Amino acid sequence: MHTVFLGTSDFAVAVLRRLAASAHRPLLVVTRPDRPRGRGRRLGRPPAAVAARELGIEVLQPPSVNDDDARAAIASARPEVVCVCAFGGLIREPLLSEHLMLNVHPSLLPRWRGAAPVERAIMAGDVETGVSIMRVVEALDAGPVCARRAEPIHRDDTYGMLAPRLQRIGGDLLVEALDDRPPFADQDDAHVTYAEKIAPGERVLDPARTPAELERVVRALTPHIGARIDRDGAEPLGVCAATIRADVGDVAPGELSTRDGALLFGAAGGALELREVKPAGGRAMPAGAFLRGHAL
């Protein structure tokens, strides 16, 4: 089947590679323009652009996928299906009506429509998530679904552990959908939840929340975004790994303290033990190493 692929992020790359290894190898990859990256703010290519060039697939990076030139380039490839995964840009009419578009979305729709479904599933304490293949429509992640597959969220899963499993499922499920062309079923609007983009303030661990809630925030934001503790009169402290210490009740909410060599952060009804931290401007390290070189 002739396909075109729209994708940008690292998540999209794994799906692109699986698609390229199938009978539905894309004739064209459309991704976002290069943008400044890192501390030096040098222009860097999107991961999908790098992967497409490695695979020998033509790459298009238009200012907007909806402009006339981009639409003409996609049409010239004569795709039977346009495959979308983590593209990061709005797809509008008339492009939507010009092609059948299938989106790889890392949640069990209609739960967690939106920009951060993997993070929100971990934060909410969901015991499972998954991948859905849906037809792209104008409304956000609201199109009918033709395939879905569940994946458990393990007790210690971070984003960095869960996302690769969902990438593999997404690639396999997309290829299966292209092979088998299963029927579409509308989503149940009564069960819709939204996965809003992670706001900067959500990175900060709020001591008014329970240790269990904070531990899930740490896992959901590790390693790509990162949780942190804001400290009065000191640089913020990144938190890369933590465990719940409900047995500790004498650490005030918001207080950083030590007990028997453990670094603790007080929260509502208990404490969070910080196992791995990242000082401002430094590298991640075990909490014990941090305590040996830094004063609280």
PLM features: residue spans?
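N-terminal Rossmann-like dinucleotide-binding module
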Residues: 1-39
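Active-site-proximal cofactor/substrate-binding loop regions of enzyme domains
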Residues: 2-5, 29-30, 38-47, 51-131
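Residue-level signal for inorganic ion chemistry
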Residues: 7, 29, 52, 174, ...
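Amphipathic, non-transmembrane alpha-helical secondary structure
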Residues: 13, 17-21, 72-75, 93, ...
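Donor/substrate-binding cores of folate-linked one-carbon enzymes
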Residues: 81-195, 199-200
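Active-site-lining helix/loop region of Rossmann-like oxidoreductase modules
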Residues: 176, 180-231
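An anion-binding loop in the catalytic cleft
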Residues: 208-296
